[in-house]
Amino acid sequence: MECPNCHKNASRVIDSRPSDENRAIRRRRECENCGFRFTTFERVERSPLLVVKNDGTREAFNRDKILHGVMMAAQKRPISSEQLDALVDHVENEIRKQGLNEISSKDIGNLVMKELANLDDVAYIRFASIYRQFKDVSGFMEAMEDMMAKHDKE
């Protein structure tokens, strides 16, 4: 590993430990040339994932977009940022488990709605109203009836 101080390619690992909930390894290194100590992180490189938008365009998967959407839906609700992060992690893991290179924005939205329905009814309705693009009250009513039917089954 190249030293950020002297740019020589001679360093040794002096400490390694798990980081980021075991999704990375943090390594403390020391340059054998100048003695400078620095930290590196090793992570699994995930294959690129493309999202196919409704208009057919493709863009790189961005978990922050999902997080922003669920944060907007969960405003002023008793939902912690940790719960929202876990929800987005679960959605991303479900997507990656499928082993696809592309996924439609519709499929992502359906996964998010499924997770939100289990977390908070109001956040689910808020997200659904944007995602499904309700044109009138009947769209809201249909989503409410779906939610009420789910509760009746429980």
Swiss-Prot record:
First and last residues of each zinc finger (unnamed): 3-34
InterPro entries for this protein: ATP-cone_dom, NrdR-like_N, RNR_NrdR-like
One of the protein's GO biological processes: negative regulation of DNA-templated transcription
Swiss-Prot/TrEMBL keywords: ATP-binding, DNA-binding, Metal-binding, Nucleotide-binding, Repressor, Transcription, Transcription regulation, Zinc, Zinc-finger
GO molecular-function term, one example from the UniProt record: DNA binding
PROSITE patterns, per database record: ATP_CONE
Cofactor(s) demanded: Zn(2+)
Domain ATP-cone: 49-139
Region (Disordered): 1-22
Cofactor binding note: Binds 1 zinc ion.
Family affiliation: Belongs to the NrdR family.
Role of this protein: Negatively regulates transcription of bacterial ribonucleotide reductase nrd genes and operons by binding to NrdR-boxes.
NCBIfam families: transcriptional regulator NrdR
Protein name: Transcriptional repressor NrdR
